[in-house]
UniProtKB/Swiss-Prot annotation:
Keywords: Cytoplasm, GTP-binding, Hydrolase, Magnesium, Metal-binding, Nucleotide-binding, Potassium, tRNA processing
Cross-referenced NCBIfam families: mnmE_trmE_thdF, PRK05291.1-3, small_GTP
Natural source organism: Salmonella arizonae (strain ATCC BAA-731 / CDC346-86 / RSK2980)
Keyword Cell inner membrane: no
Any matching Pfam family: TrmE_N
Cofactor note: Binds 1 potassium ion per subunit.
Record: residues binding Mg(2+): 230, 251
Protein name, UniProt field: tRNA modification GTPase MnmE
Binding, K(+): 226, 245, 247, 250
Superkingdom in the source lineage: Bacteria
Function summary: Exhibits a very high intrinsic GTPase hydrolysis rate. Involved in the addition of a carboxymethylaminomethyl (cmnm) group at the wobble position (U34) of certain tRNAs, forming tRNA-cmnm(5)s(2)U34.
Amino acids binding GTP: 226-231, 245-251, 270-273, 335-338, 358-360
Similarity field: Belongs to the TRAFAC class TrmE-Era-EngA-EngB-Septin-like GTPase superfamily. TrmE GTPase family.
A GO biological-process term: tRNA wobble uridine modification
Length: 454
């Protein structure tokens, strides 16, 4: 589909509501205004007008807002019609607009896409719009707004600027060896490179926090039947989300709860008790349990403390530990401390965390909550943060790898050409976050800021 088309879409959620909004963007937005409203409203003023059908009959009446480009969200001419929120009324108005030549229904996200293509937003800001809408906590909403206002992009652009400056010196030393420029060996390049690496590490740490706010942590509660898995789910959720009985195998399918711990989203999954089951339904539930375990960020290995004194997961159930994916973090949860009399709290056993609690009474559950938060490195005191997506983390990781490779080339062999290439690749990875990378970016900067002939 062409970006020269004029697009229209409903900007408010489907269904009944007090107000329904249609948004139009493109070259023919002016024609839509003149056809449906009979006039072109004064720019950026609210105008109360009837919305007319082709035969002149009034379909609805409401507020019309006219934003001529480029001073609009998309950078194009934009018309916004705010009428009553009945689905029939909005559908009639939408059908009327679509009869105007050159107007079509917008694709999902196309208004934001046009804003990006017209340099009204960079890619990270455009993504932040969706993140702000989908935010599931106050902290996530604030961080998404920070990203929309350019906080993340500013950090990335600062790194790109520093890399551009560094590349100027490196490439000058390579291309003009007779000009007595010896930046490769006098320590300046190394010092600047170390500074960029340190700044990148700081951005990566913030991005990991932002990713946690957006993606959350997937925690699977697993163990034998009657270990108290469903009771723990209820304790973490603060409500009776799962049925709890003394009958082994009560939970036969996956149960999911979405909760927050001091702003960090947590996807808690209760699974069927793991055992050799003859019942077909229970067997399917156990298969699903293993599927969830394999995709988890952390497994809470639930142990009935009344059945064993062991604390090492390898001693408690070696077959279970052997089947777990390699490097999957495990927290052993010894349950029923109210019966065994064990001291509540957390400790370390052979590289695994061990939490003693009572899911039935709730004692020790706060210790587990804090452990989950700390195990993911979540900082509840983070101010002015931003949201980040998995692709952002990947791009930052790639940039960090290129910088470390470049540093190795600099210190190991004084290989300026290889260093320059790693710096270029690092800059490209960073610029992919904002969508601003072009291969010609560096050329103009070199000739405008560095006097070679001096």
């Amino acid at each position: 589909m062409s970006h020269n088309d004029t697009i229209v879409a409903q900007a408010t959620p489907p269904g009944r509501g007090g107000v329904g909004i249609l948004r139009i963007s493109g070259l023919n937005a002016k024609k839509v205004a003149q056809t449906v409203l009979g006039k072109l409203p004064k720019p950026r003023y609210a105008d109360y007008l009837p919305f007319k059908d082709a035969d002149g009959a009034t379909l609805d009446q409401g507020i019309a807002l006219w934003f001529p480009g480029p001073n609009s969200f998309t950078g194009e001419d934009v018309l916004e019609l705010q009428g009553h929120g009945g689905p029939v009324i909005l559908d009639l108005l939408l059908k009327r607009i679509l009869t105007i030549p050159g107007v079509r229904i917008a694709r999902p996200g196309e208004f934001s896409e046009r804003a990006f293509l017209n340099d009204k937003l960079d890619l990270a800001q455009a993504e932040a719009i969706a993140d702000l809408i989908d935010a599931s906590s106050e902290q996530a909403a604030r961080s998404a707004l920070n990203s929309l206002q350019g906080a993340f992009s500013a950090r990335v652009n600062h790194l790109v600027e520093a890399l551009t400056h560094l590349r100027i010196y490196v490439e000058a030393a390579i291309d003009f060896p007779d000009e007595e420029i010896d930046f490769l060996s006098d320590g300046k390049i190394e010092a600047q490179l170390n500074g960029v690496i340190a700044d990148l590490d700081a951005v990566r740490a913030e991005a990991r926090q932002g990713s946690l706010l957006r993606e959350g942590m997937k925690v699977v509660i697993a163990g034998r039947p009657n270990a108290g898995k469903s009771s723990l789910l209820n304790a973490l959720a603060g409500r009776e989300a799962a049925i709890v009985t003394d009958i082994a195998g009560t939970t036969r399918d996956v149960l999911r709860e979405h909760i927050h711990i001091d702003g960090m989203p947590l996807h808690v999954i209760d699974t069927a008790g793991l055992r050799d089951a003859s019942d077909e339904v229970e067997r399917i539930g156990i298969e699903r349990a293993w599927q969830e375990i394999e995709q988890a960020d952390r497994v809470l290995f639930m142990v009935d403390g009344t059945t064993t004194d062991a604390v090492d997961p390898g001693d408690i159930w070696p077959d279970f530990i052997a089947r777990l994916p390699k490097n999957l973090p495990i927290t052993v949860v010894r349950n029923k401390a109210d019966i065994t009399g064990e001291m509540l709290g957390i400790s370390e056993v052979n590289g695994h965390s061990l939490v003693r609690l009572s899911a039935r009474t709730g004692e020790g559950v706060d210790v587990l909550r804090n452990h989950l938060k700390q195990s993911m490195g979540f900082d509840t005191n983070m101010e002015g943060g931003f949201l980040a997506r998995r692709r952002h983390l990947q791009a930052l990781a790639e940039a960090a790898e290129h910088l470390e490779q470049g540093k190795a080339q600099l210190l190991g062999a004084w290989a300026g050409e290889l260093l320059a290439e790693e710096l270029r690749l690092a800059q490209q990875s960073l610029s992919e976050i904002t969508g601003e990378f072009t291969s010609d970016d560096l050329l103009g900067r070199i000739f405008s800021s560095f006097c070679i002939g001096k």
